[in-house]
Amino acid sequence: MGYEQEAFRKLMSNIWGKKSRMQEEMSKGAKGEPFIVQELSREGPQTPTQLAAAMRATTGRVSTLLSALEKKGQITREIDPNDRRIVHVSLTEAGERRAEKQREDMREAVCWIFSQMGERRTREFVDLAVEFT
């Protein structure tokens, strides 16, 4: 077996075989409410259809998530005055605070990992990530 296959096997067994609490938290951010909050924070108001496309989810799933976020006071839905079939979703101040908290939590988690790796390994990791993305 070549080093590439061995490295791949080792990486995958660590990623998928040992689900850490942090990994679970980070994967939550890739779907559900955290994703919608971050998407609206980055991109501004969007329609549910745009959010579904960005999330690669059904509009029904997005509608359920939007209802939950609306109940929490984190988003508003407004009908487009020029076309009443279109609904624009925006973050409220509470939603923006949640987005900032999510970003800060992610920063802290990643910085903790980097502190455990040390400066040299962190710089190597970042250089490799930049090179291959």
Annotate the PLM regions:
Residues 20-61:
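N-terminal helix-turn-helix DNA-binding core of bacterial DNA-binding proteins
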Residues 38-42, 103, 130:
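Short, locally clustered residues in the helix-turn-helix/winged-helix DNA-binding domain
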Residues 15-22, 43, 72, 98:
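A short secondary-structure junction motif
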Residues 5, 9-12, 37, 92, ...:
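Generic structural concept
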Residues 68-127:
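Charged, amphipathic alpha-helical coiled-coil/dimerization segments
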Residues 1-31:
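N-terminal leader segment of winged-helix/HTH proteins
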Residues 65:
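Residues in the recognition helix of alpha-helical DNA-binding motifs
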